[in-house]
UniProtKB/Swiss-Prot annotation:
Signal peptide from the UniProt entry: none
Domain of life: Bacteria
Keywords (A to Z) from UniProt: Cell membrane, Membrane, Transmembrane, Transmembrane helix, Transport
Main location: membrane
Residues passing through the membrane, by range: 5-27, 34-56, 61-79, 92-114, 161-183, 391-408, 412-434, 455-474, 484-506, 513-532, 547-569
Gene Ontology CC: plasma membrane
Similarity comment: Belongs to the AAE transporter (TC 2.A.81) family.
Keyword Cell membrane among record annotations: yes
Annotated organism of origin: Francisella tularensis subsp. tularensis (strain SCHU S4 / Schu 4)
Protein known as: Uncharacterized transporter FTT_0829c
GO MF annotation list: monoatomic cation transmembrane transporter activity
Subcellular location: Cell membrane
């Protein structure tokens, strides 16, 4: 009875999914030396096992969570993707084409050696290369054969489905192991370190820090000094200090006679004052306070600073240099703020006095809230730093993604669609790019996008395993292991050859770029998910997107090509 209760509980698709998720990531922690199975591989294995209970998972569940996963991944890489479209992208497309062509040749060679019929060969290609669209294109090509009976056409179309089912499991699982474990192990790559390194290069040297890490160096520092009678600061007002040292030194607080003063721009500095000075870390502060004595921070110095981002909308500041802007907005008042960075179209600009500002530039300032309040309305629109999701644009992004999925076009009479992956991926890229150039719109905080991405891929892989589990065992029993092992060959051989061609001949040397390109050329979503998990950031998105889009077209076209070139027809 207890056994029946457990079975009935597991029949609930949501219980099965989340149990697969939990056990899969538990199994994924298995480690042997440098080999780590990983949560994605673990979820696929556990899903196949739990799938033996014939649990029905609606395909819409997997599709929805995959759409969420791929949208979040695209969003995170959107800004960098559109900036990276250059001649180097041609190498990625060449690698993708090589992978696809090698896959086709592998299928044709196996079909010739093992005397496979048109349908089985097409199924071998669809499953081993994990391209379900190939089923449709192959079936359409088979239906157009006029020289055979309808029953033979039906048999060949059935063989397409059977071949796909037999080969699909390893077609999904194999790239996970190859891309996320075997290749990095052979090449002695640490994917997380390589991803951080690549992200740093793409962000002009800004470190991609892991949770718990922080930079040991700060752009600004605050120290306390006691003013001597021969100090350079003695007798100066706070606004004079600010302007004398070109806005690089700010007096934040003053203690006089053991009392914290309420300071104004006109407040002057007296002998024996204890002042809190904030200054740029690269400033030679000793040349300014050489006559003064540094002291430990008094208890009265407990002021709070804030970082604030503004979009330049004040037309009086358009096309003005930074020096001119400083002179304009600091003309009569002491504000005590620092310019931290300027971002234009998603890219950080080097700050110099002669840099001209443009409408829509994002200006990031640092200072006390009351000082920032004074200056903000003279620059433009405030952008909230709160980690709040803009559900207006998130909803529009998903809608646009599904609309993209409805688009189809014909190549040589074959209907091609963007597919379940490219649609929301493309939408995510667009809305991530919008966020980079218009930061007041389309906010999806890093924490939220990471959660959507990770949960989406985990549920997607779990549903794939549960759904494919029963059919995989059944078809292997019915059709033997030959087709299964041929599928392994179709999955592994093109990837291995393409990997070395891309690395040594095409000179794609960056590990993350190379592995993501191979994943895209194989049109393998679980493999990309595993790579994304190991990378820990969005660096694989850009190369994957380029090669994935082209591979979808090539692999869909291979269906009719296989049907045309394989000559055997079942009796």
């Amino acid at each position: 009875m207890f056994h029946e209760v457990i079975l009935n509980v597991l029949k609930n698709p949501f219980i099965a999914l989340f149990l697969t998720l939990s056990l899969g990531y538990l199994v994924g922690k298995i480690k042997y030396k440098t080999f780590v199975l990983g949560g994605i591989s673990g979820s696929l294995i556990i899903g196949v096992i739990i799938g033996q209970l014939n649990i029905t998972i609606s395909p819409d569940i997997g599709s929805l969570f995959f759409a969420l996963f791929i949208y979040a991944g695209g969003y995170q890489g959107g800004a960098q993707f559109f900036r990276s479209l250059n001649k180097d992208t041609l190498l990625l497309l060449a690698s993708s084409t090589i992978t696809c062509v090698l896959g086709l040749l592998c299928v044709l060679v196996f079909a010739w050696i093992f005397q496979l019929d048109k349908g089985t060969a097409a199924g071998l290609g669809a499953g081993g290369l994990t391209q379900s669209a190939m089923i449709g294109s192959a079936n359409n090509a088979i239906a157009m054969i006029n020289s055979v009976s309808e029953s033979t056409i039906h048999t060949m179309q059935t063989n397409v489905t059977v071949g796909y089912a037999v080969c699909y499991i390893f077609g999904s699982f194999g790239p996970i192991i190859l891309l996320a474990t075997i290749f990095p192990l052979v090449m002695k790559w640490d994917l997380r370190k390589e991803a951080i390194k690549l992200a740093t290069e793409q962000s002009d040297g800004n470190l991609d820090l892991e949770v718990g890490q922080f930079s040991a160096f700060s752009e600004y520092t605050t120290r306390a000094y006691k003013i001597n009678r021969d100090s350079q600061l003695l007798g100066k007002s706070l606004v004079e200090v600010y302007k004398t040292y070109k806005y690089k030194v700010v007096i934040k607080n003053i203690i006089r006679d053991n009392k914290l003063l309420t300071i104004t721009p006109e407040t002057t500095i007296n002998t024996n004052d204890i002042v809190a000075i904030t200054f740029y870390a690269d400033l030679d502060i000793q040349s300014i306070i050489s006559k003064d004595i540094e002291v430990t921070k008094p208890e009265q110095f407990n002021f709070i600073e804030e970082k604030r981002s503004l979009i330049l909308t004040n037309k009086n500041l358009f096309n003005k240099t930074i020096k001119e802007v400083k002179d304009i907005i600091q003309d009569r008042n002491y504000y005590g703020v620092f310019l931290q960075k300027i971002i234009r179209s998603g890219q950080k600009l080097p700050i110099s006095d002669d840099l001209k500002l443009r409408r829509g530039d994002e200006i990031r300032l640092i200072g006390k809230p009351e000082d920032l309040d004074k200056i903000s309305n003279k620059i433009g629109t405030f952008i909230s730093e709160a980690p709040i999701t803009d559900f207006i644009f998130f909803g529009l992004g998903m809608v646009l993604g599904y609309i993209f999925g409805l688009i189809s076009f014909n190549i040589f009479g074959i209907s091609i669609t963007l597919g379940a992956g490219v649609d929301c991926l493309l939408s995510g890229l667009i809305f991530g790019w919008i966020r980079s150039i218009k930061p007041q719109f389309s906010n999806l905080p890093v924490g939220a996008s990471n959660f959507i991405r990770d949960l989406g891929l985990a549920i997607f892989v779990a549903s794939v395993g549960i759904t494919a589990g029963p059919q995989a065992i059944t078809t292997i029993k019915e059709h033997g292991l030959t087709l299964f092992f041929l599928g392994i060959g179709v999955t592994i051989i093109p990837q291995v050859i393409s990997f070395y061609i891309s690395y040594y001949l095409l000179k794609i040397k960056n590990p993350i770029v190379l592995l993501a390109t191979i994943a895209g050329g194989r049109s393998v979503n679980p493999g990309f998910a595993a790579l994304l998990e190991r990378a820990g950031n969005a660096t694989p998105v850009i190369p994957f997107t380029s090669s994935y889009a082209l591979a979808n077209i090539w692999l869909t076209l291979w269906g009719p090509v296989i049907v045309a070139l394989v000559t055997i027809i079942p009796k």
